[in-house]
């Protein structure tokens, strides 16, 4: 009976260790964006926001919003929510046209992820 209890205890410890490893290895990827990828908005947004599926490190967060001229329209550094899952940046008065949002983050698991997407502002929407 003692060996059965020992095997059960070892199995429980291994299961807990494996579940913790799976949680720790989760990378941070966008769940949603505002404006969203591919969206054409009627008026210029005051800010661009990305919601992540896992917390990100504030120190390593980057968010750029560029127009056709390549100029970064972000007004300052990105702001990170208290729970670390939301990154936003204010933008200057954007004119109608196409914009590319480029982001790069480091999750609390220390893994770097990055990506980009586009949105557009309809004519007359500045």
Report residues per predicted region:
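Bacterial N-terminal signal peptides that target proteins for export
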Residues: 1-11
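Cleavable N-terminal signal peptides
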Residues: 13-14, 24
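Extracytoplasmic/periplasmic copper-protein system
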Residues: 25-31, 39, 112-126
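Short, surface-exposed alpha-helix to beta-strand junction/turn motifs within ectodomains of secreted
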Residues: 48, 54-73
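Short strand-edge motifs at loop-to-beta-strand transitions and within beta-strands
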Residues: 85-89
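A glycine-anchored, Pro-Gly-centered beta-turn/N-cap motif
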Residues: 95-101, 115
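Beta-strand-rich extracellular modules
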Residues: 104-108
